Amino acid sequence: MKERFSPLFEPLTLPNGSQLDNRFVLSPMVTNSSTKDGYVTQDDVSYALRRAASAPLQITGAAYVDPYGQLFEYGFSVTKDADISGLKELAQAMKAKGAKAVLQLTHAGRFASHALTKYGFVYGPSYMQLRSPQPHEVKPLTGQQIEELIAAYAQATRRAIQAGFDGVEVSSAQRLLIQTFFSTFSNKRTDSYGCQTLFNRSKLTLAVLQAVQQVINQEAPDGFIFGFRATPEETRGNDIGYSIDEFLQLMDWVLNIAKLDYLAIASWGRHVFRNTVRSPGPYYGRRVNQVVRDYLRNKLPVMATGGMNTPDKAIEALAHADFIGVSTPFVVDPEFAHKIKEGCEESIHLRIRPADLKSLAIPQASFKDIVPLMDYGESLPKESRTLFRSLTHNYKEIK
């Protein structure tokens, strides 16, 4: 291994005592290869098993906690006890080489495009009329529905424990439902979850995390990992949905009620790990990851994500993070981290051919609705993205 990459292979201990032998994380990647009813398939299991040695901490693609929160047509569910057996197989595959397996819990809110197809509307904090992907309404969640949603996260955590996962991650990133309650762009409510105060906007985040923590305290084995994924600011030009200062205040409140083991920073765009603060204030222009990590230093490990598709970018990102979440490179080269460790980084292959799909355990029908997100991030070469785009034509034949 080249000396400059050695920090990537230093061990890390999470707050709960879990030991990781390097700084790589297999970050969430939805393959869209489950059943329409949200059950894990053998394709999902085989894909996970092929990457079981990729990183010591592995996080699943999004598992939806409520039918109205389903983003992807062939994503997997954690909404019912019948999901547990398939999730158990998935967890076992992820853990086959000693990795820690974490189930990501999500509700896509107004972006729950498959729920929109099924029900004709979606839910959010406040009423909206949207035009994409077709004209539709966003209905505001009632107080009772919010309570049911909080309970759904708790039940999903219970199922993750029963399925044998080593942890759960609650995602509030990239305009998923929890984040939209925190943002003044989307939260126009006037009740106790409304936009009148920062604390009110934070209430759903805090309530969900507290409910998850309660289940962990009561039912999880020692060393169970509790992660949180979030976007530290939301801006549109000069308009602010929430600032990084407000996010840091949220994290103070979060750490008072939840024993988190990491914060994963996520957002949209290319090279997210290089994002700089856009909200006015003392942090303006500094790297987002640096600001958040400095604030949380000695309190909570911070994970960088987004765009680290070379060893040089990985080590650059680690300068302002405790570990790094890699997604698309592990799709096409499960040995990405191993090759860096062995000093063989020139043999990393991000450009793949149809003949490679079988050895990579990539399902023949996969990545439907995911390729446009890959296009946006551009972490993979165009040739690989074009190949994945061709797989989306196989759904009618196979599914």
Curated annotation (Swiss-Prot):
Disulfide bonds: none annotated. Its EC number is 1.-.-.-. Coiled coil: none annotated. GO terms for molecular function: FMN binding; oxidoreductase activity. It comes from the Bacteria. It is an enzyme of class 1 (oxidoreductase). It holds the Pfam family Oxidored_FMN. Keywords: FAD, Flavoprotein, NAD, Oxidoreductase. InterPro entries: Aldolase_TIM, NADH_flavin_oxidoreductase, OxRdtase_FMN_N. Belongs to the NADH:flavin oxidoreductase/NADH oxidase family. Directly interacts with lipoylated GcvH-L (SpyM50867). PANTHER family: BINDING OXIDOREDUCTASE, PUTATIVE (AFU_ORTHOLOGUE AFUA_2G08260)-RELATED (PTHR43656:SF2). This is Uncharacterized oxidoreductase SpyM50865. It comes from Streptococcus pyogenes serotype M5 (strain Manfredo). The lineage of its organism: Bacteria, Bacillati, Bacillota, Bacilli, Lactobacillales.
